[in-house]
Amino acid sequence: MGIKDWPQGEGPREKLLLKGAGHLSDAELLAVILRNGLAGQNAVDLARNMINQFGGLRSLLSASKSQVCKLAGVGPVKYAQLQAAVEISKRIAHENLQRGQILTNPDLTRDYLMRQLADRSYEVFALLLLDTQHRVIQFVELFRGTIDSASVYPREVVSLVLEKKAAAVIVCHNHPSGIAEPSQADRRITERIKNALATIDVSLLDHMVVGDQEIVSFAERGWIV
């Protein structure tokens, strides 16, 4: 049965308008973005099938074009619709953590980093640069690829900090495996960066490791003193 044949108010768009987006399931929200389904499969059924095929909404939205377009009835247009929705979400998070904002809310920082890094299929090592009042100067992706203690150079971190005139730094990187637990290599490079920054009187406030569902904070574990 097509969505247009559903009882009034039960279609995903109508439900959203009547009750708000928070009352929709993942499949219903995705159906609103997709707009239509296939012959014999309405938009909600198509959306549910897409989510099931990838094991969840996050995995679907972080999948490559070739992976998504392998699904029956899903072509470049629907892939573009999905990516537009993802990018809008990232830009909203970026606006929420804009230049000049004082970082007084750890949850805001976590939400921003989760949106920026959790769906990457490769490792990204980044810096959140802050001024003397812990206002945001810039978020900078410094390295990409396989990151270990040998591939991250503290002198490049120091160089960027000096260039941007930062007074404090939050280091962050993601684990494409989805598991946020820091490795021994993560702890070693954190210590090296902290020591390098200390030579220019800049504080390392935290190192946050981003997984699929959580972020581990070195500061909260007492690993940065």
From Swiss-Prot:
Gene Ontology biological process terms, A to Z: proteolysis
Record-linked PROSITE patterns: MPN, UPF0758
Residues bound to Zn(2+): 173, 175, 186
Span of the annotated motif JAMM motif: 173-186
Gene3D superfamilies registered for this protein in UniProt: Cytidine Deaminase, domain 2
InterPro entries in the cross-refs: MPN, RadC_JAB, RuvA_2-like, UPF0758, UPF0758_CS, UPF0758_N
Residue stretches making up the MPN domain: 102-224
SUPFAM superfamilies for the chain: JAB1/MPN domain, RuvA domain 2-like
Cysteine disulfide links: none
Similarity comment: family membership: Belongs to the UPF0758 family.
The protein, known as: UPF0758 protein Sfri_3828
